[in-house]
């Protein structure tokens, strides 16, 4: 999937205001609804053979290109709840281009669910001929708007569009990385399976509410699942996620709380890149707070070959793909504004048992492709014909929600040091460093089956922190590296981990 097209297609121009003429309830009959119904539907669906979703569209919409799809725009004045002075509005996406799967969407009000009917006059079609009024195409997805930046303007805060992908932003941010409902066989030789959301139920918010609830039904060849998202936009936009998975077959590679991002190049990885920009990425590292209480930082890179990393754990406390660089000078891109992309932190609720945080880094020669994936992989397979429940919280925002007293690695620079060595230059910042004794501060660096030399720590007046540098003698095979700042044998920084590849 072309990533730039995906972003543009799900972020068409937005218009505010309170004009009348919003989406009408049409003729669908309401039915009783509560949170248990979606799980029952998913359970029943899993007991039946998988049926591929409908991609049938009218001939003039079946094979449109990106430009024609982008011209199909939802009319903002027809938004759900427009003119009702509620804290949220919903707009819908037309099917076509990459997004051919039919998605049904319901509004839930007073314990009753009413299907939101497809109506051609909800959209403008550019040069395309609209479908006839009797055609029921359903939708491709939806987005939610709220006055997150200004009290009188409903900005887009999240979008559900394409397979089981969804994205969100916090105040002042732009779309970047994506989350997914479920990943199956990601990075496996047998090929990845892409589950998809087939039905949504959106609860009508009360006046003055600071959250909105969305229920979702997911289907796939190997499993079904039910979700309840409680979405709270703000300085950090938070999703409370309750999910139940119903496998049709034993799932030995089910990725939980999966996310995807893009890392093209940065100061640690500029091989074969000729670009005026210092860095191009939506995320620059994977942060892990493991069950042992360790805080890990793994800078991302764009490898020559697929790289898979595993961080084994018991009951993880959190992990996420982060965008730590927040300065325009780090990117110098007036159009993309990578410094305004959100970080995404997963906070497991309850014990998730044994497993691993997985990181996949996929080679890419263009920034339009998502080439980074991360998720939690349970150690034990999820057996078929059972229910497997998980609860977690997604934090979309500038940083992790967990306060830390440890110093952090803010930048990783890598370069050649002669013909036989590679130099690593790590900048470390944080309040912890302001009270250190320089005579007792040292860098602790280890390498698996390789030699490290010239470990140096020194103040960095430009950042107010410290700089740790070292040299790795070149090897023929990949080398796993680990570094931290120590004082009196106590770690005062998080743990930096990295895989160097020849």
Which residues fall in each region the model found?
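A contiguous, surface-exposed recognition patch within enzymatic or periplasmic domains that forms
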Residues: 67, 159-161, 252, 256-387, ...
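N-terminal secretory signal peptides and thylakoid transit peptides that target proteins
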Residues: 1-14
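Terminal accessory/anchoring regions of large secretory-pathway or extracellular enzymes
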Residues: 29-66, 73-75, 93, 330-502
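Acidic, contiguous internal or C-terminal segments within carbohydrate-active enzymes
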Residues: 216-265
């Amino acid at each position: 999937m072309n990533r730039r097209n995906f972003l543009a297609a799900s972020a068409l121009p937005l218009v505010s205001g309170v004009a009348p003429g919003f989406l009408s309830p049409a003729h669908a009959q309401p039915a009783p609804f509560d949170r248990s119904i979606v799980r029952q539907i998913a359970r029943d669906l899993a007991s039946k053979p998988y049926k591929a979703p409908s991609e049938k569209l009218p001939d003039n919409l079946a094979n449109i290109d990106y430009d024609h799809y982008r011209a199909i725009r939802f009319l903002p004045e027809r938004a759900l709840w427009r003119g009702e002075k509620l804290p949220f509005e919903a707009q819908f996406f037309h099917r076509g281009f990459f997004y051919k799967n039919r998605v049904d969407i319901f509004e839930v009000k007073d314990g009753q669910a009413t299907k939101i009917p497809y109506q051609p006059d909800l959209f403008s079609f550019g040069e395309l001929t609209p479908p006839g009024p009797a055609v029921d195409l359903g939708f491709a997805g939806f987005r939610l708007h709220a006055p997150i930046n200004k009290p009188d303007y409903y900005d887009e805060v999240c979008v559900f569009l394409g397979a089981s992908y969804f994205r969100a932003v916090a105040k002042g941010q732009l779309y970047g990385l994506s989350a997914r409902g479920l990943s199956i066989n990601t990075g496996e030789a047998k090929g990845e399976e892409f589950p998809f959301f087939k039905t949504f139920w959106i609860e009508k918010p009360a006046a003055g509410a600071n959250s909105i609830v969305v229920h979702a039904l997911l289907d796939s060849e190997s499993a079904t699942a039910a979700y309840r998202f409680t979405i709270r936009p703000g300085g950090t936009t938070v999703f409370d996620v309750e999910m139940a998975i119903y496998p049709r077959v034993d799932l030995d590679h089910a990725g939980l709380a999966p996310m995807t991002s893009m890392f093209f190049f940065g100061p640690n990885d500029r091989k074969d890149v000729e670009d005026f920009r210092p860095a191009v990425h939506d995320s620059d590292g994977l942060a892990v707070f493991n069950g042992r209480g360790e805080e890990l930082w793994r800078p991302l890179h764009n490898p020559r070959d697929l790289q898979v990393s595993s961080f084994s754990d018991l009951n993880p406390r959190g992990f996420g793909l982060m965008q730590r660089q927040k300065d325009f000078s780090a990117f110098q891109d007036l159009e993309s504004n990578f410094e305004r992309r959100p970080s995404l932190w997963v906070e497991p609720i309850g014990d998730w048992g044994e497993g691993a945080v997985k990181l996949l880094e996929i080679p890419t020669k263009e920034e339009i492709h998502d080439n980074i994936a991360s998720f939690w992989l349970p150690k034990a397979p999820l057996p078929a014909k059972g229910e497997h429940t998980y609860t977690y919280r997604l934090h979309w925002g500038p940083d992790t929600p967990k306060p830390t007293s440890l110093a952090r690695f803010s930048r990783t620079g890598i370069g050649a040091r002669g013909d036989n060595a590679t130099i690593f230059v790590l900048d470390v910042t944080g309040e912890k460093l302001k009270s250190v004794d320089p005579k007792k501060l040292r860098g602790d660096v280890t390498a698996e089956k390789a030699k490290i030399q010239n470990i140096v720590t020194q103040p960095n007046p430009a950042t107010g922190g410290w700089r740790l540098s070292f040299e790795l003698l070149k090897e023929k095979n990949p080398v796993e590296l680990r570094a931290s700042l120590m004082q009196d044998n106590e770690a005062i920084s998080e743990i930096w981990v990295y895989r160097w590849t020849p």
